[in-house]
Design a protein with these regions (language model features):
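Mature, structured domains of secreted/extracytosolic soluble proteins
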Residues: 121-127, 136-161, 284, 289, ...
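Cationic, low-complexity basic patches in intrinsically disordered or flexible, solvent-exposed regions
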Residues: 8, 19, 25
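Portal/gating segments that form or line small-molecule/metal binding sites
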Residues: 80-124, 130, 137
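C-terminal and late-domain segments of enzyme folds
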Residues: 24-69, 81-96, 101, 177-319
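Class I SAM-dependent methyltransferase SAM-binding "motif I" and its flanking Rossmann-like core
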Residues: 131, 137-215
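General beta-strand structural signal in soluble alpha/beta enzymes
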Residues: 45, 103-105, 129-130, 162-165, ...
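Acidic, Ala/Val/Gly-enriched low-complexity intrinsically disordered segments
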Residues: 4, 11-18
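Short internal beta-strands
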Residues: 74-78
Length: 319
C-alpha cells in the first residue's frame, strides 16, 4: 500500500487540552494542521478550476509541499490540447509563488518518455503537476512508460510531491472514470471506465463533482468496482493524500467519500445498461475544509474550525 507508513498520525481531534495552556496549545495544534509542510511530500488531487487569482491556497500548498523556495517543479500538460499555453500559465503562477525552478515537459508522444532529458528532469524535480484536459489523452501518452514508472517510484518513496487537477486528478486511481453523463439516476450506462495511472490504486476519482452533478456516475462506478473507494472532489477543492493513509481537505468546496465497505446488495450484475441500479448500505461522507479521512481505517476526523477569542471562557464559543 503506497501511502502506509509506521509513523502515527499526530493530530487527534479528541485530545484533552489542559486549561492552563488552552490558548497556546490550541493555537499550536491549529497552526500545525493548517500550515503546509515544505518537507512533507504528498499527492494532491484537485477537483479542477482551482483558484489562480486570489488566495491560490491549493497551488500554494502544492508549492510548499514540493519544497517552497527550493521547489523544482515539472509541469506535465499532456492532457491538454494546448499544452504550451496551459503549461506557460502554470509556470508564471509557480514562479510568482517563489518556486526555485519551474519547467514544462511537453510530452505529446509516447516515444518522448524515453528521452534522457525528460528522465533527468523527473529524477531531480521535487514536484510534478498534471494539468487538466482529457484523461484518456494523458493516459495514452504516459501509461506504461519509463517516465511514468519513474514518477510513480519517486512518489511511493516519498521523494516527490504529485498534484493533478481535473483530468490530472481523474487518472490517480487504477480504475478511472473516462467520461459519462451527469444528473441522472445511477445506472451502468452513466459512466465510462478505463485504466488510470494507479498512483492511488484504491480509489476512483471524479472531479468538478457537485458543480457538474456527478454523484450518480460516481455511485455507478463504485457499484461496478465495490473493492474501491469513491472520491468526488468539487472545483477549487483538493484532497491532500498523506503517506500515512490520511487525506485532508483544502479549498472552498467539499470532498465526497463513497464507501462500499459495508455494501450488502446491488443488482448491478443482473440489469441492463440503462436500468436503475439499487445499492444497499452504501456509506457516504461529505468532508469540507480541514476534515480528514483515513483511506484504510475508514475513520473521519473533523476540522478544528475556529479558536476561541481571548474574551471567551474556556470551552465557550468554539465551533
Amino acid at each position: 500500500l503506497p501511502f502506509v507508513t509506521n509513523q502515527p498520525f499526530k493530530a487527534k481531534a479528541t485530545e484533552v487540552v489542559e486549561p492552563r495552556n488552552t490558548m497556546q496549545q490550541l493555537k499550536a495544534k491549529t497552526l500545525e494542521m493548517r500550515t503546509p509542510q515544505a518537507t512533507k511530500t504528498a499527492v494532491l488531487v484537485i477537483g479542477g478550476a482551482e483558484d489562480k487569482v486570489h488566495g491560490r491556497e491549493i497551488l500554494r500548498t502544492f508549492v510548499a509541499r514540493a519544497g517552497a523556495s527550493k521547489a523544482y517543479i515539472t509541469i506535465v500538460p499532456s492532457a491538454s490540447r494546448e499544452p504550451a499555453i496551459i503549461g506557460g500559465r502554470y509556470i508564471r503562477l509557480f514562479e510568482e509563488m517563489g518556486a526555485q525552478k519551474v519547467e514544462i515537459l511537453d510530452i505529446r508522444e509516447r516515444e518522448q518518455c524515453e528521452n534522457p532529458e525528460i528522465k533527468a528532469s523527473l529524477e531531480n524535480c521535487t514536484g510534478v503537476f498534471l494539468t487538466g484536459g482529457d484523461q484518456l489523452r494523458l493516459c495514452g501518452v504516459l501509461a506504461d512508460t519509463p517516465a511514468m514508472d519513474l514518477i510513480r517510484q519517486r512518489v511511493r518513496a516519498g521523494q516527490l510531491t504529485l498534484a493533478g487537477t481535473s483530468a490530472g486528478a481523474a487518472v490517480m486511481g487504477h480504475h478511472m472514470i473516462a467520461g459519462g453523463g451527469s444528473g441522472e439516476t445511477p445506472n451502468r450506462s452513466l459512466v465510462d471506465m478505463a485504466t488510470g495511472l494507479g498512483f492511488i490504486p484504491e480509489v476512483i476519482v471524479d472531479q468538478h463533482f457537485h458543480n457538474r452533478n456527478r454523484m450518480g456516475r460516481l455511485i455507478s462506478a463504485i457499484t461496478a468496482h465495490p473493492d474501491r473507494l469513491g472520491i468526488g472532489i468539487d472545483e477549487d477543492t483538493c484532497a491532500v493524500f498523506e503517506r500515512d493513509g490520511w487525506l485532508q481537505v483544502v479549498g472552498k468546496g467539499s470532498v465526497t467519500i463513497v464507501d462500499p465497505t459495508e455494501l450488502t446488495h446491488t443488482n448491478e450484475p443482473h440489469v441492463s445498461a440503462n436500468e436503475p441500479l439499487n445499492v444497499h448500505n452504501l456509506r457516504l461522507h461529505i468532508l469540507s475544509y480541514g476534515d480528514r479521512f483515513h483511506l484504510y481505517q475508514r475513520t473521519v476526523l473533523p476540522a478544528v474550525h475556529r479558536l476561541p477569542s481571548y474574551g471567551d471562557s474556556y470551552g465557550d464559543n468554539v465551533s
